[in-house]
Amino acid sequence: MREYYAQRAQTLEKVYQKPERQQDLREIQGKVLDVLKDQRVLEVACGTAYWTERFAPVAASVVATDYCQPMLDVAQAKIYPEGKVQFALADLHDLPAATAGQYTACFAGFFWSHVMRDDQTSLLGHLSKVTGKGTTLVLIDNNYVEGSSTVIARTDLEGNTFQLRKQEDGSRVEILKNFPTDSALRKKFGPVVRDIRIFRNTYYWMLTCVLK
């Protein structure tokens, strides 16, 4: 996965240019900004900082992390409100526990779909540790839309779905990409968070909750 995204760093944001998705993209962006306004945000898997760039002006502060240096190189070349955004090369699993009040929100865009179903519960527990209990978690991701989404190549025994994607060098690679239903999200999140809210339009979904 790291090599896949390293190759895509310069072209990753093309996925946001699909004409049929623009209205839904604006809608989901507005909702993200509403939730993250005045928050001290930890962003995991920030990638090229497409979303960082958009919510940083309304957030109180942002610490944006990713484990892929080519992605961070693109991210750090952008312009942000002075003094608001810090970047760190870090794997989510290596992030230190938050100090009291360090963060009030955690944001992850198009990350949850790349987490194996068997790993999701432990990941939520880890997020609570690195951001602090009572932190608002905000996730956004893709819906599967026939004719717009890359087709699903296979499904494993645990229900994880995979796509075949073309690399910049012309090779093809299998990528985990899950498309959870509302009921699946509530079942997974329910035992470890509170105040779950889910929004969907045609192309995207958004989940907010409070980490226990």
Tell what function each PLM region has.
Residues 94-100:
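Short conserved loop adjoining the S-adenosyl-L-methionine
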Residues 107:
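A conserved beta-strand element that flanks and buttresses the S-adenosyl-L-methionine
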Residues 121-133:
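A short glycine-rich, Lys/Arg-flanked "PGG" loop and its adjoining helix->strand segment in the class I
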